[in-house]
């Protein structure tokens, strides 16, 4: 082949509009998509990467008919290519079409190998390992979309990236599923059938991760479950058991005793001292207090300023219409300015930032607790003033954090948050200068407890995966990596931001 005769399909034509349409549809897919594994800010659509890899490895002449008028061959070739690529680039993908695409790539690769080596190379030679597969290198792999699609199309893929987050994502997306994804009767595990020695074998990566994930949940529940107690149902009329202090897992709702609610969210607001020196009240920095906006059910928190006091109360107000609430739940802090509910003084954004820089923006006020009622749909909203005894004790929790850090060596994250204009999240303007500042004491204790449990799970797995044939620390490391990614996702959702 001459250089001109080996022009690739991507150099001549790809149905960009059709690929873009499918990529847009793929973007809305959440369940089972690799983008849900871990946040990466430069995710590439899988279908677009599939088209790019296929187009880069298949010759431009692949779909050009051999017979017919020369002036029509090019247009016919483009039409044929468009039809096939539109079938190929569907998410998640048709296995039959993908297999056909693999054949196209291997046929082209076999032809190139034949010319390069001077020996006849067939597709069967490549499939059976007598000749190498086409190699695809992505030097800036990021979320791993291009290497993943290269693997899907039967290539040998290599992924590089200097960013450690990208490296973790690539391990979980590309490496570990290939090495440990399938059940292995020759390796120790916790979820597979027992071998002749009576040892439990490796049941597959997904099952092992689920097993150890449940192990971590049980351990964390035993350590900090008392901080998330069940709450007595104010509408329950029957006899209820003694007050429960243990947190029931949401997957085990049948075990929740009658007369209790399961807390699923605690709603907080940051506060600042009133700008008026003669007032000095605590001003909530909350923009809106909507809890529910559904047909025939409108629920919001009403801010009440009791005379003679310095802290507001939040009352749960419910109505069948928005007007029936009697107040505007969205009429609070606006544009970074907060109005004192006691004296009406406006705390502008500059004042709020100055208070934060002085370290006086680290106090919170619990507004409400959101619960579920076992066996029933919908949420139950309870005012914090009606459930004050169930609010966490920050002083006691801080002591538990110190004890946990001393026992495990896991400190509260003190790394500074980047402050340059390009990458900053601007929290430093409010005095939140380290990652540890972004969490309440209970959130921090929860995250540290999970981190410690994941570390212990890896140690336990390394011991249990040990066999007479040798230790398998990499399998335990793979499981722990997925669990660590889940803790990271938890940190994204459970912060004060």
Residue positions per predicted region:
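S-adenosyl-L-methionine-dependent nucleic acid methyltransferase catalytic domains
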Residues: 1-497
């Amino acid at each position: 082949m001459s250089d001109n005769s080996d022009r690739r399909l991507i150099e001549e034509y790809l149905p960009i509009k059709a690929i873009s349409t499918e990529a847009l549809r793929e973007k809305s897919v959440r369940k089972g998509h690799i983008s849900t594994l871990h946040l990466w800010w430069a995710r590439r659509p899988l279908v677009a990467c599939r088209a790019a890899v296929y187009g880069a490895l298949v010759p431009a002449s692949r779909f050009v008919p051999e017979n017919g008028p020369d002036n029509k061959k090019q247009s016919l070739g483009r039409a044929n290519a468009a039809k096939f690529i539109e079938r190929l680039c569907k998410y998640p993908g048709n296995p039959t079409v993908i297999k056909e695409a693999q054949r196209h790539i291997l046929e082209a690769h076999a032809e190139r190998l034949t010319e390069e080596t001077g020996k006849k190379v067939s597709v069967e030679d490549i499939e059976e390992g007598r000749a190498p597969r086409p190699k695809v290198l992505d030097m800036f792999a990021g979320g791993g979309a291009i290497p993943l699609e290269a693997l899907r199309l039967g290539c040998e893929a290599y992924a590089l990236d200097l960013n450690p987050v990208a490296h973790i994502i690539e391990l979980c997306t590309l490496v570990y599923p290939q090495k440990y994804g399938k059940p292995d009767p020759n390796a120790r595990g916790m979820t597979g059938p027992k071998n002749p020695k009576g040892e439990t074998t490796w049941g597959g990566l997904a099952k092992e991760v689920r097993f150890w994930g449940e192990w971590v949940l049980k351990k964390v529940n035993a350590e900090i479950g008392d901080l998330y107690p069940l709450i007595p149902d104010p509408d329950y009329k029957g006899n209820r058991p003694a007050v429960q202090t243990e947190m029931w897992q949401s997957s085990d709702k049948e075990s929740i005793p009658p007369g209790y609610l399961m807390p699923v969210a605690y709603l907080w607001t940051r506060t600042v001292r009133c700008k008026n020196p003669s007032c000095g009240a605590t001003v909530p920095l909350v923009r809106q207090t909507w809890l529910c906006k559904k047909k025939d059910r409108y629920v919001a928190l009403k801010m009440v300023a009791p005379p003679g006091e310095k802290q507001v109360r939040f009352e749960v107000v419910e109505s069948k219409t928005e007007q029936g609430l009697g107040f505007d739940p969205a009429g609070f802090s606006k544009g970074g300015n907060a109005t004192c509910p006691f004296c009406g003084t406006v705390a502008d954004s500059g004042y709020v930032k100055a208070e934060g820089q002085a370290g006086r923006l680290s106090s919170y006020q619990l507004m409400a607790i959101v619960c579920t009622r076992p066996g029933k749909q919908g949420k139950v909203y309870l005012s914090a003033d009606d459930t004050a005894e169930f609010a966490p004790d920050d002083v006691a929790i801080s002591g538990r954090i110190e004890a946990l850090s001393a026992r495990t060596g896991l400190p509260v994250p003190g790394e500074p948050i980047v402050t340059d204009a390009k990458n900053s999240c601007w929290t430093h303007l409010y005095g939140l200068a380290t990652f540890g500042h972004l969490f309440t004491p209970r959130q921090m204790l929860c995250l540290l407890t999970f981190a410690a449990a994941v570390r212990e799970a890896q140690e336990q797995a390394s011991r249990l995966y040990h066999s007479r044939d040798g230790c398998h620390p990499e399998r335990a490391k793979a499981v722990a990596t997925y669990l660590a990614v889940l803790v990271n996702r938890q940190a994204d959702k459970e912060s004060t931001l």
